[in-house]
Amino acid sequence: HLLQFGDLINKIARRNGILYYGFYGCYCGLGGRGRPQDATDRCCFVHDCCYGKVTGCDPKNDIYTYSEENGAIVCGGDNPCKKEICECDRDAAICFRDNLDTYDNKYWFFPRKYCKEESEPC
């Protein structure tokens, strides 16, 4: 669920998910095309690809379960599809955290007109 994704970003990357990543580069936020602009945008590209591999549930709307154990996010629940969504979200939040040092404000509200190059395959 997109709100849960925001929660995981807050917990893991210590950033407001929607504010920092809702409108960043060519892939962070709704849709995505072109070439990822930097490491953070690549996190979103990989997250989009991850969602694209999920079958049997709706990554943007289905609610999943997770817990925090020793500072780590552990995806759980009986539904393997929802667990997969959680893992996509968790991995993206970790990617954001690991690339905070290269986050570049010039890609915040990046004009989509610059995202015209052919997308690379997932």
From Swiss-Prot:
Domain of life per record: Eukaryota
Pfam families found in the cross-reference section: Phospholip_A2_1 (PF00068)
Gene Ontology cellular component list: extracellular region
Expression tissues: Expressed by the venom gland.
Required co-factors: Ca(2+)
Any one of the GO BP annotations: negative regulation of T cell proliferation
GO MF terms held by the record: calcium ion binding; calcium-dependent phospholipase A2 activity; phospholipid binding
Task of the protein: PLA2 catalyzes the calcium-dependent hydrolysis of the 2-acyl groups in 3-sn-phosphoglycerides. In vivo, is non-lethal to mice when intravenously injected up to a concentration of 30 ug, however does show significant edematogenic activity at the injection site.
Assembly notes: May form tetramers.
Protein family (similarity comment): Belongs to the phospholipase A2 family. Group II subfamily. D49 sub-subfamily.
This protein's name: Acidic phospholipase A2
Species this protein is from: Lachesis acrochorda (Chocoan bushmaster)
